C-alpha cells in the first residue's frame, strides 16, 4: 500500500495544551479548534496557510472538549468540563457568547446541532443526554433529559437528515433517540463493543453508523427495515462489519466522508488511518480495506479527525500534542 496521505501543513493550535476537537463550518471556510487551555480558536485560510482569525477565551473556566457549528454557520456551540455549554454568535469576524446553557452536574463532553438548526444535544459525565430547543428569539430550552446510559456519555451526533440522535458511552453501548409524543425516547441500543465507545459518525445517507472504541475496533452498523411507511415501529440496527486488527490502541474518533464515503480514524497509537468500502461489496455485509495509514501523524494521541465538507480529499486532525495537521488523501489506483 503506497503512502496516500500527504501532510499539507502542521499548526500549533493550542500550545502547551491538548487540542481536543476540530469542527469545520458548513461552507468549509473556517475551522474551530478547542483545547485544554480553555479556549476556542477560529482558523481561516490565508493563501496556503491556516491562520488564527480569533480566540474565544472568555466563555469557559475549564477545558473545552467539543465544538459544533449550527447548520447556518452563524452559531458555534462549545462543551466544557466546567459543566456548561456556550453558544457563540458570529458577527462579521468576531464571536460573542450570547448564552450559557447550564444544568449538567459535571463535565459536558459533547455538543451537536440537529440538521434543522432548531435542536441541540449535549451529553455529560453525569450519564445524561439533554435535548435543547432553540426558538426564533434565540432562547434555549431543555425539552428532554435522557438517562439511558449507566456511565459517562462521550459523544452525541445527529442523523444527517432526520431528527434521530445517537450517543456513545463509557458503558460500552450506543443509544439512539427520537421524539415521540412531545418527549424524547431511547428507541435502540447498539451493543457489541467490549469497552468504552468514544465516538460515532453517520454516513451521508444516515443508513449506516460507524462507532469506535477503547476495544481498538471500529464497527459499522446498518439500519435494517424501517417498518411500514409512516409507521412508528423502530428501525433495527445491526452490526454488519467490524474493522479489527488495524489499530493498536484506543480509537478515539471516527469520521465518515459525506462526499466520498471514506472513513478516517484517530487513534491512541498517534496514527491516522483511512478505510474505504471495497468495490462490489454487499451492502448488507460490507467489507472495508485500509487504504492509507500515517503511523506518526502526531507525537501523541490523535483525538479527532474531520473531513472538509466541500473538498473531498482534505482531512484535518488534532492531538494531545496541541497541534492540528492538514492532510491530502489520494485514493490508491
Swiss-Prot record:
Keywords: Repeat, WD repeat. GO terms for biological process: iron-sulfur cluster assembly; protein maturation. InterPro entries: CIAO1/Cia1 (IPR028608), WD40/YVTN_repeat-like_dom_sf (IPR015943), WD40_repeat_CS (IPR019775), WD40_repeat_dom_sf (IPR036322), WD40_rpt (IPR001680). CDD domains: WD40 (cd00200). Gene3D superfamilies: YVTN repeat-like/Quinoprotein amine dehydrogenase. WD repeats lie at residues 14-53, 59-98, 103-142, 148-187, 192-231, 246-285, 297-333. Pfam families: WD40. Component of the CIA complex. PANTHER family: CYTOSOLIC IRON-SULFUR PROTEIN ASSEMBLY PROTEIN CIAO1-RELATED (PTHR19920:SF0), WD40 PROTEIN CIAO1 (PTHR19920). Belongs to the WD repeat CIA1 family. This is Probable cytosolic iron-sulfur protein assembly protein ciao1. It comes from Xenopus tropicalis (Western clawed frog). The gene is ciao1.
Amino acid at each position: 500500500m503506497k503512502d496516500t496521505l500527504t501532510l499539507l501543513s502542521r499548526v500549533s493550535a493550542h500550545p502547551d495544551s491538548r487540542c481536543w476537537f476540530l469542527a469545520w463550518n458548513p461552507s468549509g471556510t473556517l475551522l474551530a479548534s478547542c483545547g485544554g487551555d480553555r479556549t476556542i480558536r477560529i482558523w481561516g485560510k490565508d493563501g496556503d496557510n491556516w491562520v488564527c482569525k480569533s480566540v474565544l477565551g472568555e466563555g469557559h473556566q475549564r477545558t473545552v472538549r467539543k465544538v459544533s457549528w449550527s447548520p447556518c454557520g452563524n452559531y458555534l456551540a462549545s462543551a466544557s468540563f466546567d459543566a456548561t455549554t456556550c453558544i457563540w454568535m458570529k458577527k462579521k469576524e468576531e464571536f460573542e457568547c450570547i448564552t450559557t446553557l447550564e444544568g449538567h452536574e459535571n463535565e459536558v463532553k459533547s455538543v451537536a446541532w440537529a440538521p434543522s438548526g432548531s435542536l441541540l444535544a449535549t451529553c455529560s459525565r453525569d450519564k445524561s443526554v439533554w435535548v435543547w430547543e432553540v426558538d426564533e428569539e434565540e432562547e434555549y430550552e431543555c425539552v428532554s433529559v435522557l438517562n439511558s446510559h449507566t456511565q459517562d456519555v462521550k459523544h452525541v451526533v445527529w442523523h444527517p437528515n432526520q431528527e434521530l440522535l445517537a450517543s456513545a458511552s463509557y458503558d460500552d453501548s450506543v443509544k439512539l433517540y427520537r421524539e415521540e409524543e412531545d418527549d424524547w425516547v431511547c428507541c435502540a441500543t447498539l451493543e457489541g463493543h467490549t469497552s468504552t465507545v468514544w465516538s460515532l459518525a453517520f454516513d451521508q445517507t444516515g443508513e449506516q453508523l460507524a462507532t469506535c472504541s477503547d476495544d481498538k475496533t471500529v464497527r459499522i452498523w446498518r439500519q435494517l427495515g424501517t417498518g411500514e411507511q409512516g409507521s412508528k415501529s423502530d428501525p433495527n440496527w445491526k452490526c454488519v462489519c467490524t474493522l479489527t486488527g488495524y489499530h493498536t490502541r484506543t480509537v478515539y474518533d471516527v469520521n465518515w466522508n459525506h462526499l466520498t464515503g471514506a472513513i478516517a480514524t484517530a487513534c491512541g497509537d498517534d496514527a491516522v488511518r483511512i478505510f474505504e468500502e471495497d468495490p462490489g461489496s454487499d451492502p448488507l455485509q460490507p467489507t472495508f480495506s485500509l487504504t492509507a495509514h500515517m503511523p506518526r501523524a502526531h507525537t501523541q494521541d490523535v483525538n479527532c479527525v474531520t473531513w472538509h465538507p466541500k473538498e473531498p480529499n482534505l482531512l484535518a486532525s488534532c492531538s494531545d500534542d496541541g497541534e492540528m495537521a492538514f492532510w491530502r488523501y489520494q485514493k490508491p489506483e
